[in-house]
C-alpha cells in the first residue's frame, strides 16, 4: 500500500552509512515511524529536506512483509528558522513534541492534532510573546483532543455559571462551584482568570493562550494552571514529567 501525506519531522536517526529512520506526525495517519533508505545521499528523492521540525510532503509505502513503512520520497513545504536559533523556543517546542509522542496520535485524531502542531510551529517561529507556559497548556489541549475535556464554564453538579472562583476535582475531572465543593475529593481552587485561560486553550489557537497583562494575575494563572494540568494529565493519561522526560505511570 502506498499513500501521500503532509508530515512534520519529530525525530531523526541514522543507521548504516546512508540510511535514515524518521518519526513523523502526519496529517491523516497520526504518528508513524518509517525508514528512508539512502536518506543521507539521495538528493533526488529527499532534496535535503530531512531535518528535525521540517514540514514535508511524503510518499510512504508499506514494506512487502507489512512489518514497516518505507519513506519513498519527500519534498520540503516549510522549515523553521527562529526555532533553530533560539534554544529556549526550541526547547519549549520539543517538550510539546515529546509529550505528543508519549500520548500517541491515531489516524482518527490526526487532522486536528496536525493543525494544532502547525499553529504551534508558527507561534514559536514568529511570535514574541511569553511562551514558557505554552508546553503546560499544550498538554491540556492534547488531553482534550483525546477525549479528556473538562468543562470550565459551568459547575458540573448544579450547572451554575462559574463567574468567580471554581474548584477542580482531579479524579473526577470536573469543575464545581463553592456550593457543590463537597461533591469532589481534594478540591483545588482556581480563579476566574485561570478558568478563562483554560477555556481558550481547549478551543482557540495558541496565539490566544495569553496570560493576563497584570503581573500578579499572570503569576496566579501560571501557578494554578500548572498545578491542575499536571495533576490532571498524570491521573487521567498516566503521564508525568520527571528528570527531564515524560514517563508513563
Curated annotation (Swiss-Prot):
TM annotation in the entry: none
GO terms of biological process kind: DNA recombination; double-strand break repair
One Pfam entry name: RecO_C
Keyword flag DNA repair: yes
Record has DNA repair as a keyword: yes
Keywords: DNA damage, DNA recombination, DNA repair
Any one GO CC term of the record: bacterial nucleoid
Its biological purpose: Involved in DNA repair and RecF pathway recombination.
Similarity field: Belongs to the RecO family.
Name under which the protein is recorded: DNA repair protein RecO
Amino acid at each position: 500500500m502506498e499513500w501521500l501525506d503532509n508530515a512534520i519531522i519529530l525525530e531523526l536517526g541514522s543507521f548504516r552509512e546512508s540510511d535514515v529512520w524518521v518519526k513523523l506526525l502526519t496529517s491523516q495517519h497520526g504518528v508513524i515511524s518509517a525508514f528512508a533508505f539512502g536518506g543521507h545521499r539521495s538528493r533526488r528523492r529527499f532534496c535535503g529536506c530531512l531535518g528535525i521540525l521540517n514540514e514535508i510532503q511524503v510518499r510512504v509505502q508499506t514494506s512487502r512483509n507489512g512489518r514497516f513503512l518505507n519513506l519513498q520520497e519527500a519534498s520540503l513545504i516549510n522549515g523553521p528558522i527562529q526555532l533553530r536559533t533560539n534554544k529556549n523556543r526550541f526547547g519549549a517546542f520539543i517538550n510539546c513534541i515529546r509529550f505528543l509522542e508519549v500520548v500517541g496520535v491515531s489516524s482518527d485524531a490526526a487532522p486536528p492534532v496536525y493543525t494544532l502542531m502547525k499553529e504551534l510551529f508558527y507561534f514559536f517561529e514568529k511570535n514574541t510573546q511569553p511562551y514558557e507556559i505554552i508546553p503546560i497548556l499544550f498538554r491540556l489541549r492534547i488531553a482534550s483532543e483525546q477525549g479528556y475535556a473538562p468543562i470550565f464554564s459551568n459547575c458540573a453538579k448544579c450547572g451554575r455559571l462559574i463567574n468567580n472562583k471554581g474548584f477542580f476535582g482531579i479524579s473526577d475531572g470536573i469543575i464545581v462551584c463553592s456550593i457543590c465543593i463537597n461533591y469532589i475529593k481534594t478540591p483545588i481552587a482556581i480563579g476566574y482568570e485561570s478558568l478563562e485561560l483554560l477555556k481558550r486553550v481547549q478551543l482557540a489557537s495558541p496565539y490566544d493562550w495569553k496570560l493576563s497583562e497584570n503581573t500578579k494575575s499572570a503569576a496566579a494563572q501560571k501557578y494554578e494552571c500548572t498545578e491542575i494540568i499536571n495533576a490532571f494529565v498524570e491521573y487521567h493519561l498516566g503521564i508525568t514529567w520527571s528528570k527531564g522526560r515524560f514517563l508513563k505511570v
